Amino acid sequence: MARRRKGRPIDGVILLDKPTGITSNDTLQKVKRIFFAQKAGHTGALDPLATGMLPICFGEATKFSQFLLDSDKRYRVIAKLGERTNTSDSDGEVVETREVKVDRGQLERCIAKFRGTTDQIPSMFSALKYQGRPLYEYAREGIEIPRESRKITVHSIELLRFEGHEVEMEVHCSKGTYIRTITDDLGEMLGCGAHVVYLRRTGVSDYPMENVVTLEQLQALRDQAIEQGIEPGELLDPLLLPTDSAVQDLPEANVTVEGGDAILHGQPVKASQLPEQGTLVRITVGEQRDFIGIGEIDQNNMVAPKRVMANKQDEA
């Protein structure tokens, strides 16, 4: 007999403002406990040093978390020139100190070289896996693992402030871009070394930063609910964004109620005004535009289901 999953079966996305000094997974577990959720997962780890937007998906939304993992990110970073560390941030040990002889013009010319699509070699102090273990575990043991470079795209990188040995920048980049690595590479270009002292993620996909909430705010709502003798979910759940917010960038394919039933049973259906073959679409049903999953336009110009909502299948 299958063991019953502990927690509430809730669906949706919460935009957490991750605090510094804690891992993304520890943050996830705290949020999961506050909501008493059955199932939850985050959508792209932030370094312990980093703060900012960490979308956490609950229940059915976890099926679509890959779209947030693959989406563009935005960051605000402050780098310190003159010191290089083994982790490329201030959590590591200083391994080299050099004199800083940099003017603003030189700095802006070097920053400009990061714009566009380039190859980046991930840091050893990253969560990328090698033989089932994250690279940072090998790094802590003094083991260097060969890493292949990966294509990244920096859509924009702007210098906001240059004071003394501090450089503040704003970066809009593709998934898999390591800001620590950009900072370390910038320091080497400038000939003085550099490392990250502050990093804040200010955007994931098109989610607005004003929707983020802190752990303290969530805990306060839970405590308030308990004090008032009501279910914590009554105060917490209104903060959840809808499940389909994770796939908001996909074009919509609106099908009839009958078509929706067919989709939920694994059958492709016809719909009007569809994009070209091979395009992933967000499937909605009827005039209410109720989200039921994602599909792909097949060779017959029909909407073929790829991933659908289990709770909608139960209703179909």
From Swiss-Prot:
Gene Ontology biological process terms from the UniProt entry: mRNA pseudouridine synthesis; tRNA pseudouridine synthesis
UniProt KW keywords: Isomerase, tRNA processing
EC top class, as a word: isomerase
Organism domain of life: Bacteria
GO molecular function, one term: RNA binding
Signal sequence coordinates: none
Disulfide bonds: none
InterPro entries: PsdUridine_synth_cat_dom_sf (IPR020103), PsdUridine_synth_N (IPR002501), PUA-like_sf (IPR015947), PUA_sf (IPR036974), tRNA_psdUridine_synth_TruB (IPR014780), tRNA_sdUridine_synth_fam1_C (IPR015240), TruB_C (IPR032819)
Active-site residues, Swiss-Prot/TrEMBL: 47 (nucleophile)
Catalytic activity: uridine(55) in tRNA = pseudouridine(55) in tRNA
Record's keyword annotation contains DNA repair: no
Family matches, as SUPFAM superfamilies: Pseudouridine synthase, PUA domain-like
EC id: 5.4.99.25
Family annotation (Gene3D superfamilies): Pseudouridine synthase, PUA domain
Keyword tRNA processing: yes
Pfam families (UniProt xref): TruB-C_2 (PF09157), TruB_C_2 (PF16198), TruB_N (PF01509)
Role this protein plays: Responsible for synthesis of pseudouridine from uracil-55 in the psi GC loop of transfer RNAs.
Family membership: Belongs to the pseudouridine synthase TruB family. Type 1 subfamily.
PANTHER family with a match to the protein in the record: PSEUDOURIDYLATE SYNTHASE TRUB1, TRNA-PSEUDOURIDINE SYNTHASE
Full protein name: tRNA pseudouridine synthase B
